[in-house]
């Protein structure tokens, strides 16, 4: 990859966007950003608290602003929040400003990877986690697919293996 194109990782919670994003950025010698971490940095509070205080709409407004700013940078890897694709503006920006990689995973893997994580506001509800994840998948998977330039399943692969697959796919395009 001669020129450093922005790489934007989208996908559901537990797909490995942050872990794979860090690995990918390291291998490509690019800057890594995580939209949730940027929101936390700017607000001084964790995303769960922001979500509780401002509701999902307030959180999504912050997320949209952060992603807009970050996608204006050059040569970055950005791990987006799982729900960021709900915003048409965000989808358009991601598509226009870089390569969008959809990290796909099964509900079973999502459950295994998120079961002890208390920083997932959408899972801190009364409904069974499987039902929540299935509903989110039904709503969001078509949006991930709509903007994806590349789709990679992450289920039983290490971050390094997935990062190498992404690099290979980008080099062959």
Curated annotation (Swiss-Prot):
GO terms for cellular component: cytosol. One of its GO terms (biological process) is amino acid biosynthetic process. Mg(2+) binds at residue 18. It holds the Pfam family SKI. One of its GO terms (molecular function) is magnesium ion binding. Its main location: cytoplasm. Its EC number is 2.7.1.71. It is an enzyme of class 2 (transferase). Keywords: Amino-acid biosynthesis, Aromatic amino acid biosynthesis, ATP-binding, Cytoplasm, Kinase, Magnesium, Metal-binding, Nucleotide-binding, Transferase. It is found in: Cytoplasm. Transmembrane segments: none annotated. Pathway: Metabolic intermediate biosynthesis; chorismate biosynthesis; chorismate from D-erythrose 4-phosphate and phosphoenolpyruvate: step 5/7. Belongs to the shikimate kinase family. This is Shikimate kinase 1. It comes from Escherichia fergusonii (strain ATCC 35469 / DSM 13698 / CCUG 18766 / IAM 14443 / JCM 21226 / LMG 7866 / NBRC 102419 / NCTC 12128 / CDC 0568-73).
